[in-house]
Amino acid sequence: MAATDFIVAIELGSTKITGIAGKKLPDGSIQILATTSEISSDCIRKGVIYNLDKTTQSLTSIIKKLESTLKASIGKVYVGIAGQSLRTIRNTEVRHLEEETKVSQELIDTLMDSNRMAPIVGYQILGVVPQEYKVGLDLTIDPVGVQTDHIEGRFLNIIARNSVKQNIVQCFEQATIGIAEDSEDLIAPLVLAEAILTPSEKRSGCVLVDFGADTTTILIYRNNILRHLAVIPLGGNNITKDICSQQIEEEDAEALKIKFGKAYVEPTEEYDENKIFSLDNKCSIQAQLLEDIVEARTNEILDNIANQIILSGYENNLMAGAILTGGASNMNKLEEAFSKRTKIQKIRFAKETQYVIKGSELPKDGSYNTLMALLAAGKENCCLAIPEVITPEPIKEIGRKDIEGQLFTMDGESVEEIRKQEELQRQRAKEAALAAEKAAKEAAEIERKRKIECEELLKEAEGFKEDKKFKEALKRLSKAREMQIPEKEGAISTLEKEIKKLKEENSIGNKFAAIFNKILEED
């Protein structure tokens, strides 16, 4: 029986691209309907697409396999942004008000919009996490309703290189696969954090570390707010490649790492120079050499994690400790090594998400956590809705039932031809649905750019106001009003009143100055 209500998620990993289809059940659990994957080491590096054509081919193959299992067409999917270059930077936006004013949500939105327009060459802002607001001399998370003449908005911007998102969108377009509307700026590490961290951990302060194949992602939370995010371009594959340098095939190197590798070797542990690690007589390596290789590279990764924790400024505020996840977190003795290098004693391993899973069993080693988190974040039905086509009843055969030949309807039409037409209609309906979705996204992008342009005009007007160039300021406001953006009307009107008031005061001041100068001249 074909599935008609399901969510599809795709994870773009450095070793494989994985697709999953599932259904959210009334009891809150998730039923897995289908999973499949394709090797991605030849098209994705450090979590970022570098070969668009090969990625497109893999995506097309994954969708076909999922559709075959589901016996239904997939209209859109959920996909997250991750990989190298993804990180956070801080920014502060300041507003000096002419008089004591009650802070409104509109003013907060204006600060947020200004922050989003902060120029970052070569990068784009994917998400914004407000940290706090300084109202007068006080710091608060929710300033709406407070009286003040000065406000600062402190924001944490999540950024990535422009090409990261562009390449994802381009590959999905080439594969004629729609991306769910609420998945446009889905940041995979944040979704993972929601699926793994408890409210208590996020409140008390913790560091979440996702050990991947090519990258290691670090997130720091405190008081339920993301405080820092960074991606280190090192992962489990780096250890494997170091072992490969000993003239060992990559597949065997990976097996040696998993079977014999240790992230931490006790200083008191005696070395046996003659001890050898081998795999069914296929390959072998001196035990001490393997341990040295694995420990050295692991320490490099852990030292980078420790450095990011220090850079965040929250190294002394992680009461809930560290939560480790990801496929590469299964390294033997990782807990001891992590504690030694980061000085964090409280460590928890998250081998699976908090969601109850039904249906197919997934590996409980942390490698599917991000994929499950993306699936759980999905809200829209990903099944492609295709208009139902009524198939005419074929003519009943008269006489021998074993007569072979073409079937025709009562109207004399070929049943085979009708089936072909139905398939063509389905394909056209799918293309029309994708085209409509693309048009909607383009319209939304145009509207977003209009809002940015309007905000720029407001900022220019604010600048001219400060310079007492009131005529120029009012011209900018007039242009902004002509754009007819409802949510900006309030800000335009408020600023217009301020400028007109200042212009009038300035005019009166000039008149008094002229009279005073005339009196002085007469004297």
Where are these regions (language model features)?
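Glycine-rich phosphate-binding/hydrolytic loop that grips phosphoryl groups
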Residues: A350-I403
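Short glycine-rich phosphate-binding loop at a beta-alpha junction
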Residues: A72-G83, S312-G327
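Nucleotide/phosphate-binding catalytic cleft detector across ATP-hydrolyzing
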Residues: M1-K16, I20-K76, I81-C206, A263, ...
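Residue-level signature of catalytic and energy-coupling elements of molecular machines
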Residues: A9-I10, G19, V79, F172, ...
